[in-house]
């Protein structure tokens, strides 16, 4: 496990007592792939410090349609699992493990108390929040101004980079959930990509054959 101290670049700005309290508030946890860790405003489990694995942060519409907001990887911090600390945040987000994930869980009460007394912790937390909202605003730009074929092409390229593989173990339904659209739309456009020689489709998998072609589509 990555030590708690390595998640905080402001660690040396904390007092010895604050360091001790933060480490004491962190509990080692493990979540297998597919685990729902946080279900919107219903719970406030605490701050998640990811030692290994991958988390997906997403939201769900009233009709049950999902859309991925961003992913978190090793050494990232998940704030929205402790949304009760963020009084200005009024929307519900879900957090699930996409891969087997080891993490530290820091209690909301302990971290909130440290934020109130430590300017370095408060400023660091605000910088993380600003970064996440920047990612969400980028997504909004994609939703408003990008065609779906552009978004799918970009998604496939990003997934290939994330997995370091041109063969993606993804269903059309999973892509639809990430992008907030219908499975039929994904299927139609993937078949178009295949006809263009950019991808090869098989059951539960997509192989990228021409990344340059996908790059052109995504622009």
Spell out what each predicted region is.
Residues 1-33, 77, 82-86:
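Cyclic nucleotide-binding regulatory module and flanking cytosolic helices
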Residues 36-42:
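Short phosphate-coordinating micro-motif centered on Lys-Gly-acidic
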Residues 71-127:
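Cyclic-nucleotide recognition modules
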Residues 37, 69-70:
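Local beta-strand/beta-hairpin segments that build beta-sheet-rich folds
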Residues 62-69:
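Short alpha-helix-to-loop micro-motif enriched in aromatics/charged/Gly
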